[in-house]
Design a protein with these regions (language model features):
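Short acidic-glycine-tyrosine-enriched beta hairpin
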Residues: 66-81, 192-207
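Short histidine-centered beta-strand/loop micro-motifs
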Residues: 20-23, 41-47, 88-90, 142-143, ...
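Short, conserved beta-strand element in jelly-roll/cupin
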Residues: 35-36, 46-62, 155-159, 172-188
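Structural motif
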Residues: 59-61, 68, 84, 178, ...
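Ligand-binding loop in jelly-roll beta-barrel domains
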Residues: 25-27, 81-108, 207-233
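Conserved short histidine dyad/triad with adjacent acidic residue
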Residues: 13-17, 32-47, 154-173, 207
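A short, N-terminal "cap"/entry segment at the start of jelly-roll beta-barrel domains
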Residues: 1-28, 106-154, 159, 235
Length: 235
C-alpha cells in the first residue's frame, strides 16, 4: 500500500489544512495545519478527546480551564480530554504556525463552545524539544504524560547522508506512522518504492509496510512522528 503524502502548499495560503483527515481512513489520528495571526486565537472549545499540538513557529498563550501557559516554537502540547482551551497569539513573534493531531474518534465531532460547561481541570503538558534528554529519549509526549492513544516523537536532525535502520534496510510494524516534516527534504522508501518528502509534508505510512528514511541532500531534515501508544518502547 502506498503512503499518503500531502503538503501544506496544496491548500490555500493561511487557510486551515486538513492534511490527514477521516476521509483518508487513517487507523489512528488525523493531522491538521493552521496559522494564528497576531492578535488572533484558535478555536475556543471543549470536547471528550485529547489534542496534541506542535508549534512550528511563533509564540503565545495556551489558556486551559482559565489558566494561562506560555507556549513557543518547538513546544509540544498535550491537552487532556474535557479541558476548555484556546490558544492566543500574543507573543509578539509574528504568526503562530502549528500542527494539531486528534484521535480518529474526534471525527465524530461534538466539540462544544468554550465556556459552555466546566472543564475537568486537568493541567496540560507542555514540553519543548530542547528539553529532551537521555531519560526522555525522542519522546516529546507519551504514556508518562497521560496520553491515552498516541505518542509524539521528535526525531531530531537527520544529517546529510544518514539512513534509518541501515542494518535491515528499514523496518515495519503493526501501527500507522504519521509524520510531519518540519525542515529539509529527504527520501522515504516504502516497500521498495522511493518518495521524495519535504518541509510541510504530512505523511501516513500504512501498517506493516517495510519503510526506511534517507537524507540524500546537503542539509538536515527534521520530523515529528505520531505512533500508537502501544509502540512505546519499541523504537
Amino acid at each position: 500500500m502506498e503512503p499518503l503524502i500531502r503538503n501544506i502548499k496544496d491548500f490555500p495560503a493561511g487557510a486551515p489544512a486538513r492534511l490527514i483527515s477521516a476521509d483518508d481512513n487513517p487507523a489512528l489520528v488525523t493531522l491538521a495545519y493552521s496559522v494564528i495571526e497576531p492578535g488572533g486565537t484558535s478555536s475556543h472549545h471543549i470536547h471528550e478527546w485529547e489534542h496534541e499540538v506542535y508549534i512550528i513557529e511563533g509564540s503565545g498563550t495556551l489558556v486551559a480551564d482559565g489558566k494561562e501557559y506560555p507556549v513557543k516554537a518547538g513546544d509540544a502540547m498535550f491537552i487532556p480530554p474535557m479541558v476548555d482551551h484556546v490558544t492566543r497569539n500574543d507573543g509578539g513573534d509574528g504568526n503562530i504556525r502549528r500542527i494539531e493531531i486528534n484521535p480518529i474518534s474526534a471525527a465524530s465531532g461534538n466539540a462544544r463552545p468554550g465556556g459552555s460547561e466546566p472543564g475537568a481541570g486537568t493541567p496540560p503538558v507542555i514540553r519543548n524539544h530542547a528539553d529532551l534528554n537521555a531519560e526522555t529519549g525522542h519522546t516529546m509526549l507519551g504514556g508518562r504524560d497521560g496520553c491515552p492513544n498516541y505518542l509524539m516523537l521528535y526525531n531530531g536532525a537527520m544529517q546529510p547522508g544518514a539512513v534509518s535502520h541501515p542494518e535491515t534496510g528499514g523496518h515495519n510494524h503493526e501501527w500507522d506512522h504519521t509524520v510531519f516534516v518540519l525542515e529539509g527534504t529527504g527520501t522515504l522508501v516504502v516497500s521498495g518504492t522511493e518518495y521524495t518528502v519535504t518541509a510541510g509534508d504530512a505523511i501516513r505510512v500504512p501498517p506493516v509496510e517495510h519503510h526506511q528514511w534517507k537524507n540524500e541532500t546537503d542539509a538536515p531534515m527534521l520530523r515529528v512522528t505520531f505512533n500508537d501508544i502501544k509502540s512505546e518502547g519499541h523504537g
